[in-house]
């Protein structure tokens, strides 16, 4: 299937398991501090064996197609640990995961797992919002001496601030679906109402100041 067909198909699957939540009156607060009427809980895909396998295979396919030089996989904690491990298993590659900060006990590791020296790493992420935590993981891997060849993720909001951050960091991002495809599919199927679309449009215009 084409990339556009994949994005539409995966968007439909996310809606089917009710992974998309809309709460304009009681907005979600993200780690970045932004308020959002919209939340994509794509970790729910792990609970459905057929869908879990779909995500694993499509992410693995994305790695093979776009980053064939990868010799290892790293997941971003905590959301992408499971997805990253599944992809690494499918590709038969070494795996590690990157914490948001070092453990405060034991080995105090930031990177958990052992990769070959100089490994070419593809990073697996579950969701991209501002890109901050994802690129923090990239930075940790680079400082540890690994080459980051790119990143694959299940979903992105496609914010300009994130796209700019990825460009500046020199990281290519490939995702299975995105905000535009999910909202279009939700609108087409009646998952959201027209007034909801207006709220989402207002939020998407300037999410940093929405509801402040």
In which residue ranges do the predicted regions lie?
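Active-site-facing substrate-recognition patch
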Residues: 1-66
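Solvent-exposed alpha-helices and their adjacent loops that cap or buttress functional pockets
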Residues: 66, 113-117, 165
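Conserved acidic residues
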Residues: 71, 119, 149
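Short, glycine/charge-rich flexible loops or terminal/linker lids adjacent to PRPP-binding catalytic cores
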Residues: 84-122, 130-135
């Amino acid at each position: 299937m084409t990339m556009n067909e994949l994005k539409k198909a995966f968007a439909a699957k996310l809606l089917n398991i009710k992974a998309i939540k809309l709460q304009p009156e009681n907005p979600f607060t993200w780690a970045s501090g932004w308020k959002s009427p919209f939340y994509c809980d794509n970790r729910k895909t792990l609970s459905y064996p057929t869908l879990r396998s779909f995500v694993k295979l499509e992410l693995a396919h994305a790695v093979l197609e776009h980053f064939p030089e990868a010799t290892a996989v790293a997941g971003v904690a905590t959301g992408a640990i499971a997805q990253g491990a599944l992809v690494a298993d499918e590709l038969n590659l070494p795996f590690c995961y990157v914490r948001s900060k070092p453990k405060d006990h034991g080995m105090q590791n930031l990177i958990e797992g052992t990769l070959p020296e100089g490994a070419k790493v593809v990073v697996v992420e579950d969701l991209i919002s501002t890109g901050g935590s994802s690129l923090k993981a990239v930075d940790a891997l680079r400082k540890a001496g690994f080459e980051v060849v790119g990143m694959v993720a299940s979903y992105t909001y496609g914010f300009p601030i994130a796209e700019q951050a990825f460009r500046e960091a020199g990281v290519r991002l490939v995702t299975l679906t995105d905000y535009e495809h999910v909202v279009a599919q939700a609108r087409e199927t009646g998952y959201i109402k027209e007034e909801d679309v207006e709220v989402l449009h207002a939020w998407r215009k300037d999410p940093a100041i929405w509801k402040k």
